[in-house]
Amino acid sequence: KGSILGDKTRMEQLSVHPNSFIRPSPSAGSLGGVARKTRETIILCEAAGFDKIFVETVGVGQSETAVHSMVDFFLLIQLAGTGDELQGIKRGIMEMADGIVINKADGNNIEKAKLAASHFRNALHLFPAPDSGWSPKVLTYSGFYGLGIKEIWDMVDEYFAFVKANGYFEQRRNEQAKYWMYESINEHLRDSF
């Protein structure tokens, strides 16, 4: 099971690249927006030598936050021009974001994307500073024209340099390992009784 056709349709170039591996995992029946064994899959990919691992959730909502306990960088991707950019976002998800990207910033949507980015930047100032000490950035992106991808990579690289220098990266990895162990024990107990 999985959305292999949908994934490959959206990732024409990436899906055929010799250095990439795409593993669709159905999340049906599990909360958190990710499949039950996503954490284990991440560890396997790291062991296989993949240095950049992307985990896509099923959507945005309060239940799609489990992925935050599994990843080193939480990127929130939003569409502009839907009319309720900020109203539709749960506070908890915005507080988790290490970066926010406004997608489809092209054609008639460019100004809407810039406005949405401005709204998100303003909203981020209302939240307490993240434990990492990092100030999340808000960028725009056009997949159609390929505009903004360099800026997104630069943001991610800047984030990793920042959190590795201040020790937060290692602290976060330790927290992830503890959370994974806790969840594994809970899952085993639920399945046993």
Give, region by region, the residue ranges found by the protein language model.
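Short beta-strand/turn micro-motifs at beta-sheet edges
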Residues: T9-R10, T65, L86-R91, L126-P130
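Conserved phosphate-donor/acceptor-positioning beta-strand/loop module used by diverse small-molecule
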Residues: L75-L79, V101
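Canonical P-loop GTPase G-domain recognition
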Residues: R91, M96-V101, A105-N166
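Conserved nucleotide-binding/hydrolysis micro-motifs of P-loop NTPases
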Residues: S27-G29, G59-G61, A80-D84, A105-I110, ...
